[in-house]
Every structure is written in C-alpha cells, then in structure tokens.
Amino acid sequence: MNRIFRNTIFYLLIFLVIVGIVSVFNSDQTETENVSFNEFAERLENGQVQELSVKPERQVYLVRGQFNDQAEDEFFQTYALRSEQTAELLFNAEDPTGTPFNLEIEPADETSGWVQFFTGIIPFIIIFILFFFLLSQAQGGGSRVMNFGKSKAKMVNEDKKKAKFKDVAGADEEKQELVEVVEFLKDPRKFSAIGARIPKGVLLVGPPGTGKTLLARAVAGEAGVPFFSISGSDFVEMFVGVGASRVRDLFENAKKNAPCIIFIDEIDAVGRQRGAGLGGGHDEREQTLNQLLVEMDGFSANEGIIIIAATNRADILDPALLRPGRFDRQIQVNRPDVNGREEVLKVHARNKPLNDDVNLKTIATRTPGFSGADLENLLNEAALVAARHDHTKISMIHIEEAIDRVIAGPAKKSRVISPKEKKIVAWHEAGHTVVGVKLENADMVHKVTIVPRGMAGGYAVMLPKEDRYFMTQPELLDKIIGLLGGRVAEEVTFGEVSTGAHNDFQRATGIARKMVTEYGMSEKLGPMQFISGSGGQVFLGRDIQNEQNYSDAIAHEIDLEVQRIIKECYARCKQILLENKDSLDLVAKTLLDMETLDAEQIKSLVHEGKLPDDHHLNAHLEKEKASESDVKVNINSKKEETPQVEAEQPQEPNTDEPIEKDPSVEDNRSFEDDTNKKE
C-alpha cells in the first residue's frame, strides 16, 4: 500500500509539472512596455491610442492598451492614481477617429496577499518535491536518498534456511568446527561452565568451489538465531564515508538481535592489507576496514555476535583482521580427498536416478583434485548427456563422457584434420602413454585419445595412483620425463618435431625451476630457496614485487641447473622410447584406428602387444557411441543416423616426408590436459 501511495504521488507531481510547463508556453507572450502616465496622457491627446482597458486596484488604476504610431503596434501599460481627474480623462477618452472608447473595465482583484504569496512559491515547492522523488528512485537496491549509509545485510528468514549440516559432505573436520559455534548459541552454559569463550570470529579459507558459502548457509539453517548475510563488496560505494557507516549500522542491527551470526562473503574485498602497494592508499576502503576492526574487537564489546567470513585470498588480508580476538579461528576448507569426493557425490546424486552400473567410489577415484562445485557440475553434465539420448537413468557411460567434457570440453569429431597431423597427434600421445606406463614413479595412464575436445587436438589423462599432498624428487623427475614423451616420440619417429609440445615444455620447465629455486633439490646449489621478485602475483594492498635474494651469478647457476634437469630427463625419455619402439608404434597405430584407449587397453597393448578380449572392446565402442552426441543432437526427438567416421588405416610413418611447421598446429592441439596436475 505504501508503494502504491508513493507511485501515485510521484505521477501526480509529474502531471502538475507538465501542466505548469504547458501553461507557461501557452500564455500570452506579447511584449508589453511600461510607460509613464504623462506619456500616456500625451499620446492619448494626440490620438495615438487605439485600444484601452482599465482595471481598478486598491489605490490606482491599471491602464492597458495599444499605440498605433509604430511600424508594429506596441502594447503598453501604466498606473494612475484613483482620482476624479484621472477618471474623467480615462472615461472621456476618444480614439483617433474621434469615437469614444468602448472602455473595458476589468473587475478589481480582491485576492489577499497571503494567497498571492503562496501562489508564487507553490511551483518551487513542487519542483523540490519532484527532485526529492527522482533522487529516491535513482538509489539502487531499494535504498533511498537519506539512508544510503544503512547496511545492506539481509536477515535470512526461517523459511529460507534450507541448507543443513547433512547437506555438507567431504568436510567433516571443518563442519565440526562450526557445529561448536552453533552449540554455543543454543546452549552457552555448557561452555561457560568450564570457562570457555566461543570464538568471536571464524574465517573460512580455501580454493573456489570447496563449499565455504555452503558451510555458512548450513550454519544459518542450524543455528536457530538471526543470521545476517552480506558481501564484502556491499560496503564501499561511490559516497565517501558510506562504508564505515554501513559497518556501524550492521553491528547496531546485530546488537538488537543478539545473539546472532554475521556472515561476510568475500571479505577480501574490504579487508585487504593496508599499505603503499598498488591501490594500498585507498582511504575509503581503509576507513571501512578500520571501522570493522573496531566493531569486531574495540573499546566496546559486542557480546553475542559471532562473525563468519569466507575468502579464497587469505594471504592478502590485513594482519590486524586475523589476530585472536577478531578471527580467533581459521578453518582451511580444502578440496576433498577420495572419501570426501564419494560423500559429495552421494549428496549431489540424491535427486538423480542412477543406473546399477554407476559406482560412486570409482568416480571419486577418477576425479582427483575436483572440488565440490566441480563434482556437482560433473553429475549435472552426466544428466544432460543422458537426457540428450532420451535415457531415464544416468549410467556410467554418461558419467565417463561428462568427465571428459569437464576436463577437456565437448568432443569435436566433425573437425577436419589432415592425415599428416592426425599421425603426428597419434605418435605424440602414444609417447606420453608408453613413457607413463614404463616409469615406476609416474602417474597412472588412465586414458588417451586423439579425438579433438575443446582447444585440444588430443590428450592423455594421467591420474595419481592415490591422493597425495607432496611429491618426492623421483616423482617430480618422472613427471618431467612423462611430459617430454610426446616431443621425443615425434623426434624418434619422424626425425622432426612440431609445435604441439608447447604446453608440455612450459609445465616441465616450471617443475624443474621450482625444484631448484623452491624445493632445494639441486645438488650444486644445495637446500636453499631463491625468491624472485617477478614470481609473485600482483594484487592490491601489497607491494608489487619482492626483493630478489640472490645475485646475478646465482641466477646464472639456476638457469644452468634447470637446463641440466631438462636435458637429463629428455635423454632418459629418449632411451625409454627407443627401447620400447615397438610398443610406441603399436599404441599409435591403434589410436589411429580406434581414436580412444582406456587404461586396460593401454596396459594390454604395452605389456602383451594386443588388445584385450571383445567384451572390453565392445564396452569401449559403446562409450564412443555415447560421445557421438557432441556431433549431432536430436532436436526434433527423432532418431538420426549416427555419422560414420572413417578411421585412417594404420600405416608405417614415412620418416622421409618432411613435417610442415604450421603455426596453427599449436593453437589446435594441446596434447596433455592440465588436470593431470591435480594432486
């Protein structure tokens, strides 16, 4: 009702302004000259007045008329005292022809002075009110011109608290930390009886997609107390002082509803380090941060208010914000391990019909490094693939296809690839595959394909045998050797190389440099860490670069050590492929024929020199049939013929034929997917 009333007043004011503007433009725009009464009397006597009207006022006559002695008739007005002599002059006046004027006597204006006063100021009042409404309508987010300093925090209603702790999986320890906060709010005597103090602030830190906001929503659903939610970017806006004002208003509202919880999402937007770095001198943001520090733990205590914040950039937060008394507890929300991934998959599979062949444990093993958001997206993609084939349940084939789509993008079987490039891709991926199988400490080769997906012309999926949180020196060296396998395979097979190993070199060089500069794995330089000013990220609130803690001579030694590691790994990789040249050619020829090989087929080819039995081969072909949906989609719900892809017949590589170094090859092929780095 209040909104309808405001809209009615607003449109009424617009109507009045339009009427006023129209009346002004439609009024008599004729110019009128003010003349003295003596001049008027003289012209009247000379017969130069052709129209005349008289309007009696309090003590004078208002005389209006028109002269006829100009090229253009001129209108005039004058004032005359009300006397018998003036009345005789006016009422006996004659026009130039000697005919007495048909004198028009206008009625006297009996309007009071107060009415005239208010009539003059009403237009200004209307303009002021209209300006006020225009400003109020211009304020975003439903706020008004006089309350832009109010907090934008939203109190979560009871009916909207849908998330519970049972909806959070794969983060048992993190969930337990927050369960204590909820228990304190429900039964504070349990903790106060032994002198315990609940943390004033809890900071959730972790990579994107790990469930930090979901944990906060679960706290809101379980707490049973008022829950305020706000984003860190909602504090600072265009007006100076708004940020600090909104912080004060937020805590004032929280005090009125204590005990309560305040959740600040992406707190790094307002809690960046203060300093002279790039953007570090932002006075408005620093003022907002200072006010937040005072409200969290300042001179006046805020009892019963618990603050939960989330960020994925804890390294750039101000140290004063992280000290005990403000954020007493920091909870690291990492990506789930294999057991956590299985629990997350169970949560997201509740409303999805799964076929009997779906094994969530196997999927969890196949997806190392996936966050909770990645796993949710994976099952959603699998459901979309199943719906595309008009299936009523999600099978393992659909999930395998969804994993490939999430890792490398949709298959592009319609992409035209020349036989020469297809041959290069096949031997390149076969090189990665054979080296990965033969190395003891390398990641397990799970799948290899030459089917283009996304920007990749082919890729090999290398998965760790188990979840790990650190790597040994032999494992790092074997990883470099595996990355160089594609380039070495091209060299030993064709005698020339292509640009397809661009990403492989980038990653291999990065690992080797970290071994020397960060991990202390160089025998020549010893167990030391060398910090480079250009290696860190540039962000607001901190210096642009760190000082280099080593000399130019040491920098030269670092380059030599990195070069030595790469060359030794390259030589080792070349030795492996030359010793297993038959396996390399067999895998490459089979890839040209089948395009995709799974882990069991790869092991059988390398160790036994043949493919496994027909049962497994048929399962593989059925998987390939499911991926055909990326080429043709049945829009009209009618069955279409599956396009027949003619596979190139395996041929011995022609080493005499030169390889064209087309720069487009680099753009079309990224032979090994980055996700095999996930550990």
Curated annotation (Swiss-Prot):
Cofactor: Zn(2+)
Entry's Gene Ontology molecular function annotations: ATP binding; ATP hydrolysis activity; ATP-dependent peptidase activity; metalloendopeptidase activity; zinc ion binding
Record-listed Zn(2+) binding positions: H428, H432, D504
Region Disordered, residue ranges: 621-679
TM ranges: 7-27, 115-135
Record CDD domains: RecA-like_FtsH (cd19501)
Binding partners and assembly: Homohexamer.
Protein name per UniProt: ATP-dependent zinc metalloprotease FtsH
Gene name as annotated: ftsH
